[in-house]
Amino acid sequence: MAHISRTAYANMFGPTTGDRLRLADTELFLEVEKDFTTYGEEVKFGGGKVIRDGMGQSQVVNSECVDVVITNALILDHWGIVKADIGIKDGRIFGIGKAGNPDVQPNVDIVVGPATEVVAGEGKIITAGGVDTHIHFICPQQAEEGLTSGVTTFIGGGTGPVAGTNATTVTPGIWNIHRMLEAVDDLPINVGLFGKGCVSKPEALREQIEAGAMGLKIHEDWGATPAAIHNCLNVADEMDIQIAIHSDTLNEGGFYEETVKAIGDRVIHVFHTEGAGGGHAPDVIKSVGEPNILPASTNPTMPYTINTVDEHLDMLMVCHHLDPSIPEDVAFAESRIRRETIAAEDILHDMGAISVMSSDSQAMGRVGEVIIRTWQCANKMKLQRGILEGDNEHNDNERIKRYVAKYTINPAIAHGISHEVGSVEKGKLADLVLWNPAFFGVKPALVMKSGLVAYAPMGDINAAIPTPQPVHYRPMFACYGKAKFKSSMIFLSQASIEAGVPEKLNLQSQIGEVKGCRNISKKSMIHNSYTPNIELDSQTYEVKADGVPLVCEPATELPMAQRYFLF
């Protein structure tokens, strides 16, 4: 039997079972748990390599082989960290296993044929495209920024750079919803829209859902009253959609307890649970302990650093249409910025008590930094809290799975789209992100939408090869022509699909049906379902989880930052 050293094998085919990789410049290390390929029968493309006629490539016709194969990929997902080939057919993940030619190779379950394109996954980490559930649709250029960061799905609301959208993720009413659906149809990213949920009678809510809203948003700037909350959730239960809420910072319509009473035992997605982004001051963070609340963070407070508090006041004044010359407006802003709850937020994420990460794009948050901020927090917590339960001195696999779930599968589950996106699993859209380990979480090597490359770093177009400087991200073929419609999906409520909205608006993108939003709970949040008893001191803002104070120092230095960016 022939032998090869681990180093030589990793250089040729990528890491295998037991090998370890460092994520970017963090102190996080993954270890490969399983290898689905067959030693000695690996497939690889190139001169003198395996994927050639009669060798790793079979003779079958188009219908019997995959359209795309990603060879020797290291998959990092909530369900595992494994080495495998990934087959893609008709824009969806066909299989995860062993690719090749079954005529001459054993254990092949992904057939490579004349119709198969090859993406080299050797030495790359593959994750599912991110799902950002807190998008203010202030400008369409956010799609490019999000895609080039590794996010492939936007959920939120808005109509452009106007006061309502700068403050709230709401696309209100039939006309606005229809115009925005027609607009986002042209974007190479998956999109779902929130209607306005701040209504105390059901008719205005039903018509928005029937018009194409995939969910509804309750926001204090439109009135987050107990009556609106109760009514909105009634309609959600009736029409199987999710409700997102930014609760009442000023406690004008009621205190935290009144909001919880209005919610009852029904599921709801609470945005920026820490509170700097808005919500009952100072105790909205207690919602982390509710079994029917799906808690989320937005990225401006993540992770807690020496600069976090100072930058927030001015951001808040701009986003919520406040005037620094009005004392009441300044007091409103200051009531939301609390060092103690911001520090506790990091720890709650590490405990798996906050389930989702999102951006709050251009409305205090940064649309291109959801993934970076998630891993910066994971790194900060490892340095400050040590090895997570289930991990060891050799790897951080459990912590890594917990954090990747926050921006992939959990937001997809929360909004009823996990049957389409959110993980690297058979049958789902092939929205995949390839990373060089040294650039993991920072700068993707390839961003694929439905199996076709949407964005990639590309060098001088007039150069003899693709790599000469200047290298920067450019849109690829999934962003052009009719291909962009086949590569992206618009998520709609079941009621709007039945009402024929896609046909009435002549939407050309794929249509995804929102379903299963009302039968979930905090327990549905993978690796992030911990529901501690949260206590908050209203005078000192000290936060306790199950009686233990949640205290950590602000970071003075972060990975995935200046080492990778000039600006």
From Swiss-Prot:
Its cofactor is Ni cation. Transmembrane segments: none annotated. One of its GO terms (biological process) is urea catabolic process. Keywords: Cytoplasm, Hydrolase, Metal-binding, Nickel. Pathway: Nitrogen metabolism; urea degradation; CO(2) and NH(3) from urea (urease route): step 1/1. The active site is at H320 (proton donor). It catalyses: urea + 2 H2O + H(+) = hydrogencarbonate + 2 NH4(+). GO terms for cellular component: cytoplasm. Ni(2+) 1 binds at H134, H136, K217, D360. Its EC number is 3.5.1.5. Substrate binds at H219. Residues 129-567 form the Urease domain. Carboxylation allows a single lysine to coordinate two nickel ions. It is found in: Cytoplasm. InterPro entries: Amidohydro-rel, Metal-dep_hydrolase_composite, Metal_Hydrolase, Urease_alpha_N_dom, Urease_alpha_subunit, Urease_AS, Urease_asu, Urease_asu_c. Binds 2 nickel ions per subunit. Ni(2+) 2 binds at K217, H246, H272. GO terms for molecular function: nickel cation binding; urease activity. The modification N6-carboxylysine is found at K217. It is an enzyme of class 3 (hydrolase). Pfam families: Amidohydro_1, Urease_alpha. Heterotrimer of UreA (gamma), UreB (beta) and UreC (alpha) subunits. Three heterotrimers associate to form the active enzyme. NCBIfam families: PRK13206.1 (NF009685), PRK13207.1 (NF009686), urease_alph (TIGR01792). Belongs to the metallo-dependent hydrolases superfamily. Urease alpha subunit family. This is Urease subunit alpha. The lineage of its organism: Bacteria, Pseudomonadati, Pseudomonadota, Gammaproteobacteria, Vibrionales.
